[in-house]
């Protein structure tokens, strides 16, 4: 059971990057454009299902980040931050835009990061006058929000993977953002923020083909781009929605004391010391699946810009969510995968009932506890196991084979570093189990490549002398009648209908796909041994119980979060196997009155243990008699030697007196 779960768990960690959407409705109501046919990537090779538990762990990690930032924000400024240069105390600042200030909004679109061409009418995308700072009741929906939609005519540089920026200016009513208009421009009456609105994403191309015919279903244009740019191409992508939030905040911030990541949004004026209104570009609800690539076939791009006020606590949540993970030093691939995991979280938040979502978070905490307890009890069970009676040794070796195939598969598919490390640790644990089920020695007379000692494996005596070995061999012989034909059929199917990078990749993907589909069959030998022995007392029931509970929790996650059908079937089949274990535990229950080969029953052993414990307690409460011993008599008393074995050794008799010798 553990082996199949490890295969499913590792397989679910390898997730392919999501593609573009076709006619999809985004979370804020806009409809995404269809991706042009020539930009569609090739059909990726079948990838394992995403792991629901990894998604939930991401939610918990983000909740912790939000809590940490909120606690940091509520904390008072530290004393050392209260003094500025020269030891002068720092004074709490104020917002340069008081509440209910009349504002004008100017939105410009440009290819340049630094915008100066205010006279270009083509650059002005949206202009909204007489907005009220802190107004939550105006707008079409009486929520303080406004929006503007238009088609952007994009230049050739943007079509050829260039960047495009949005420049947002808020000015007090009666002023203009152009510094060259001296009469209408005021520095303290203008707040500006810009951002690149296209997003660069990696598109990976794996050159695959049918190994028998040499043909491929990949787009010829994609093959040509892969030859020109390599297997990984960075392509500009577009999403048609972006929201401009102005934070309704008048906190007396102190310069130098704003906690991260909030400090990157609070901008202070160098002269007055006050801070500008906080502008936040909110694209949190823009799902990755709604992005589509920008290429030369697109002459225009749709853009819907929304303006909404934002409360302080919601801004803190968004700022914490947009903060990059500290694990980004492991590679950009991990960051891209975290974006896809965030998409799963967002979909769950949008489509799941709040009560069910709260229950899922609570159960996920229980899942983490069970996961740790299952790991701890598994290690303790194998570490303290002295007899292999009733345990399938071959299943342990098959588990090592499964873990090794999974490791080679994720290395061949260039999965991120964290997944590789986790699978490698699992392989080491499985290899350690071999030393507990077999006698492993190093033969230094025979060396591998003349350098490394050759390991030798020998069955333990407790395994050879028991009937378990016979039943284990019999179970795997019956199992081979099923596995090998299925393996042959799957290999032929994979060779005829699937594309691969080469023969090595075909072997790995064929073995991995076979184990992922039929790996649960390897749990049946232990069921067969239990049936033959008519006993389940030899199984690590604590570990199995924790893993079964985790499987039931995975069932809940699989139906709360969108998962492939094969993943849900995998959870169901593990449940079925565990119910068979429970049925065997019920029919092969332990009989305390049964007499073993030594003529003892479980009741006799328990009664003897109780009597021994009672006599020990009584002896501890009864004081030993004390007698006075003279010096001469004391010399004749034998001295007790230390050690536990002296009580069982016979003592020599004292020498006989002379009168007794004469009588003899």
Curated annotation (Swiss-Prot):
Gene giving rise to this polypeptide: Clptm1
Superkingdom as given in the UniProt entry: Eukaryota
Topology within the bilayer: Multi-pass membrane protein
Function, as annotated: Involved in GABAergic but not glutamatergic transmission. Binds and traps GABAA receptors in the endoplasmic reticulum (ER). Modulates postsynaptic GABAergic transmission, and therefore inhibitory neurotransmission, by reducing the plasma membrane expression of these receptors. Altered GABAergic signaling is one among many causes of cleft palate. Might function as a lipid scramblase, translocating lipids in membranes from one leaflet to the other one.
Annotated PANTHER family: CLEFT LIP AND PALATE ASSOCIATED TRANSMEMBRANE PROTEIN-RELATED, LIPID SCRAMBLASE CLPTM1-RELATED
Annotated Low complexity bias: 1-16, 618-628
GO molecular function ontology, one term from the record: GABA receptor binding
Region (Disordered): 1-51, 618-664
Miscellaneous comment as given in the Swiss-Prot or TrEMBL entry: Mice overexpressing Clptm1 exhibit an aberrant development of thymocytes.
Transmembrane segments: 355-375, 391-411, 417-437, 478-498, 503-523
Cytoplasmic-facing ranges: 376-390, 438-477, 524-664
Pfam families in the record: CLPTM1
Residues glycosylated per entry: 28, 119, 161, 241, 295, 413
Modified residues annotated as N-acetylalanine in this record: 2
Keyword Transferase: no
Biological process, per Gene Ontology: cell differentiation; regulation of T cell differentiation in thymus
GO cellular component, one term: external side of plasma membrane
Family recorded in the similarity comment: Belongs to the CLPTM1 family.
Compartment list: Membrane
Protein name (Swiss-Prot/TrEMBL): Putative lipid scramblase CLPTM1
Modification type Phosphoserine: residues: 601
Signal peptide start-end: none
């Amino acid at each position: 059971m553990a082996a199949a779960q490890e295969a499913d768990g590792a397989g679910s960690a390898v997730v392919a990057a999501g593609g573009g959407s076709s006619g999809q409705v985004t979370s804020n109501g806009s409809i995404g454009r269809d991706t042009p046919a020539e930009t569609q990537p090739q059909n990726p090779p079948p990838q394992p299902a995403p792991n629901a538990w990894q998604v939930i762990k991401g939610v918990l990690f983000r909740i912790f980040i939000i809590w940490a930032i909120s606690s940091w924000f509520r904390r008072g400024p530290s004393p050392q931050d209260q003094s500025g240069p020269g030891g002068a105390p720092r004074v709490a600042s104020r917002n340069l835009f008081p509440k209910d200030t009349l504002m004008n909004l100017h939105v410009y679109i440009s290819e340049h990061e630094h915008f100066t061409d205010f006279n270009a009418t083509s650059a002005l995308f949206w202009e909204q006058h007489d907005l009220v700072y802190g107004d939550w009741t105006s707008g079409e929906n009486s929520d303080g929000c406004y929006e503007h939609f238009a088609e952007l005519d994009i230049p050739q540089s943007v079509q050829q993977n260039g960047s495009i920026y949005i420049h947002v200016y808020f000015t007090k009513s009666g002023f203009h953002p152009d510094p060259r208009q001296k009469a209408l421009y005021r520095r303290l009456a203008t707040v500006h923020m810009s951002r690149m609105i296209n997003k660069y994403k990696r598109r990976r191309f794996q050159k695959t083909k049918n190994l028998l015919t040499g043909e491929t279903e990949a787009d010829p244009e994609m093959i040509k781009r892969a030859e020109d740019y390599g297997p990984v191409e960075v392509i500009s992508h577009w999403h048609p929605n972006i929201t401009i939030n102005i934070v309704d905040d008048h906190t007396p911030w102190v310069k130098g004391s704003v906690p991260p990541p909030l400090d990157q949004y609070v901008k202070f004026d160098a002269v007055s010391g006050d801070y500008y209104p906080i502008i936040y570009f909110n694209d949190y609800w823009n799902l990755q699946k709604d992005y589509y690539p920008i290429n030369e076939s697109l002459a225009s791009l749709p853009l819907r810009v929304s303006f909404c006020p934002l409360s302080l606590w919601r801004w803190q949540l968004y700022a914490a969510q947009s903060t990059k993970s500290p694990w980004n030093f492991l590679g950009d691939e991990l960051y891209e995968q975290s974006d896809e995991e965030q998409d799963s979280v967002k979909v769950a938040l949008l489509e799941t009932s709040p009560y069910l979502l709260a229950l899922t978070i609570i159960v996920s905490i229980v899942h983490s506890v069970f996961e740790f307890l299952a790991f701890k009890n598994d290690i303790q069970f194998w570490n303290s196991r002295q007899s292999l009676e009733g345990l399938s040794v071959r299943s342990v070796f098959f588990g090592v084979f499964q873990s090794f195939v999974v490791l080679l598969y994720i290395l061949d598919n260039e999965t991120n570093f964290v997944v590789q490390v986790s699978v490698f640790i699992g392989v080491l644990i499985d290899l350690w189990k071999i030393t507990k089920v077999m006698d492993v020695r190093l033969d230094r007379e025979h060396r591998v490549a003349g350098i490394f000692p050759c390991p030798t494996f020998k069955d333990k005596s407790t395994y050879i002398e028991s009937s378990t070995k016979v039943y284990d061999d019999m179970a795997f012989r019956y199992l081979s009648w099923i596995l090998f034909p299925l393996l042959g059929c799957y290999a032929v199917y994979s060779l005829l209908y699937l594309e691969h990078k080469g023969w090595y990749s075909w072997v790995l993907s064929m073995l991995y796909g076979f184990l992922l589909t039929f790996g649960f069959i390897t749990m049946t030998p232990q069921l067969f041994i239990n049936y033959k022995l008519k006993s389940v007392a030899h199984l690590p029931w604590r570990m199995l119980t924790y893993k079964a509970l985790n499987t039931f929790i995975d069932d809940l996650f699989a139906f709360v979060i969108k998962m492939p059908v094969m993943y849900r079937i995998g959870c169901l089949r593990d449940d079925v196997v565990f119910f068979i274990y429970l049925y065997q535990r019920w029919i092969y229950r332990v009989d305390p009155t049964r007499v073993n080969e030594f003529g003892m029953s479980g009741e006799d052993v328990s009664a003897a243990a109780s009597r021994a414990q009672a006599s020990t307690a009584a002896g501890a409460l009864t004081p030993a008699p004390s007698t006075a011993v003279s010096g001469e008599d004391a010399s004749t008393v034998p001295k007790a030697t230390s050690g536990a074995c002296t009580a069982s050794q016979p003592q020599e008799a004292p020498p006989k007196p002379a009168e007794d010798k004469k009588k003899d």
